[in-house]
Amino acid sequence: INGQDSMVTNLDSNLQVGSGYSQYDVLQKFSFAQKPGVFHQLNLQLSNSSNIDRYDRLTQLSGSKPRFAEWYYGPQFRLLAAYTLELSNQTKCYDQARITFAYQGIEESRIDRRYQKDTRNHRIEKLDIYTLNADFMKKINKHEVRYGLDAFINNVNSTAFSEHII
């Protein structure tokens, strides 16, 4: 109230005023049958949100006063792009193959400020995830042999800083 952290009793303890957030998700898939036995698929996904308040953190007490004046997740962002190639033509090595290359980028953050303190803490995580997955199947007489490969690279970047808000 008037720029000061204040403790106010909620008249309806079952209602968390201002606890909503917005989010959008977009998904698009493209498929293409190049010829018999060769199938391509592209999967694109995008997700983004507004700040997401953590009211459970705001109800924590330190003595008789709130522990935090602010505690929320910053906007969360996620991008996925995956290309899959499916082969069903018989070769010496396989009868069926499914190979997927994918990238996923994620950014999320956490922001908090202790009650009646003028320092806001920011923690930001950025992840870049690259994957390759290959599955193969070969029939040999009455038997079926399955084998594959799974590889991934995770790049994680975490940063933190404090902001003086006055």
Name what the model sees in each region.
Residues 128-130, 150-152, 164-165:
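Pyridoxal 5′-phosphate
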Residues 1-21:
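Surface-exposed beta-strand-turn/loop segments characteristic
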Residues 25-27, 80-84, 100, 129-135, ...:
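Membrane-embedded beta-strand positions in outer-membrane beta-barrel channels/transporters
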Residues 111, 157-160:
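Short, conserved acidic/polar surface loops in the N-terminal third of protein domains
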Residues 40-42, 95-101, 143-149:
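Transmembrane beta-strands of outer-membrane beta-barrel proteins
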Residues 17-23, 33, 37-94, 105-127:
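Flexible loop and strand-edge segments within Gram-negative outer membrane beta-barrel domains
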Residues 46-50, 103-107, 140-142, 151-157:
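Transmembrane beta-strands of outer-membrane beta-barrel pores
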Residues 2, 58-59, 159-165:
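Short, flexible, mixed-charge acidic loops at enzyme active sites
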